[in-house]
Amino acid sequence: MDDNKKKALAAALGQIERQFGKGAVMRMGDHDRQAIPAISTGSLGLDIALGIGGLPKGRIVEIYGPESSGKTTLTLSVIAQAQKMGATCAFVDAEHALDPEYAGKLGVNVDDLLVSQPDTGEQALEITDMLVRSNAIDVIVVDSVAALVPKAEIEGEMGDMHVGLQARLMSQALRKITGNIKNANCLVIFINQIRMKIGVMFGSPETTTGGNALKFYASVRLDIRRTGAVKEGDEVVGSETRVKVVKNKVAPPFRQAEFQILYGKGIYLNGEMIDLGVLHGFVEKSGAWYAYNGSKIGQGKANSAKFLADNPDIAATLEKQIRDKLLTAAPDVKAAANREPVAEVEEADTDI
């Protein structure tokens, strides 16, 4: 850059700082690039698929899938992991369907969990914005976007047409709260439902509710599906679950993780660690027997997972070994993610 351009740039930067305050414009090289802090999902495989060891703080995340696929269970697992780190969490229950007893079984400290059951979509999003701006909340879950019903629709007649109201509400709210979420370093998770588009001949007819705004503003989008049943004899005790990272602004997307959700217990982490340990050479498998560090830990996956549950120190060591091996490339990705600007999107006029 020649001297005239340097002087012009210095003058412009000086004027910007006087008008908007120090730090309004900064050089990326003046400060060390820090890794994006993440909150574990409670699933080791999903943490690895996300590339940074969990869901990114200071960002919006969307989790969507069919009914009974594990959406709420996954978000409650995130809250449980965050609370273990001393985080303060809130649950905006627009569906009015949160079960405190089930949340407690998944490890959530329900006594410390902030819960809101708003009457309208505007109220839910306003409460979310106020919680974010308090700078005191680390994780907020909104369950769900489909239940964020605009006030005009609630007060109207049952058969009235309200085209695009929910989409406009989401677009306006996300424009308002995105910057606040980044400043507060708060993770906001929106749970969403699936609808079918009519008349689609090619491609998937599936879409999510609430318009297109959330798709743009979300840094991470997770598609969660139930792929089968976990059985003990003839009794169904859980679900085989697959989560695909459909969008990821902080690491490479389109990775996926498969794990089990056990009814009344949540994500089967110890079973995941056995599978990943065998896959990456930390756990040896010979026939039906599993061994770790040369010592047999159990016959069959269930007994080996029980050994890890009974020996948390060994489980923590194995988990750290797996994370250290599979998340070594994450810092470069995280640094690159910090350079991404937040995109402004056009308001979605229709709910598609």
Swiss-Prot record:
Stretches of the chain forming a coiled coil according to its record? none
Q: Which Pfam families match?
A: RecA, RecA_C
What is a single cellular component term in the Gene Ontology annotation?
Answer: cytosol
Q: What are the protein's UniProt keywords?
A: ATP-binding, Cytoplasm, DNA damage, DNA recombination, DNA repair, DNA-binding, Nucleotide-binding, SOS response
GO MF annotation terms: ATP binding; ATP hydrolysis activity; ATP-dependent DNA damage sensor activity; damaged DNA binding; single-stranded DNA binding
Q: Name one GO biological process term.
A: SOS response
Sorted alphabetically, which Gene3D superfamilies does this protein's record hold? Answer: P-loop containing nucleotide triphosphate hydrolases
Task: Summarize where ATP binds, as residue positions.
Answer: G65, P66, E67, S68, S69, G70, K71, T72
Record has Repeat as a keyword: no
Q: Where in the cell is it found?
A: Cytoplasm
Primary role: Can catalyze the hydrolysis of ATP in the presence of single-stranded DNA, the ATP-dependent uptake of single-stranded DNA by duplex DNA, and the ATP-dependent hybridization of homologous single-stranded DNAs. It interacts with LexA causing its activation and leading to its autocatalytic cleavage.
Per the similarity annotation, which family is this? Belongs to the RecA family.
Q: This chain belongs to which protein, by name?
A: Protein RecA
Annotated organism of origin: Pseudomonas fluorescens (strain SBW25)
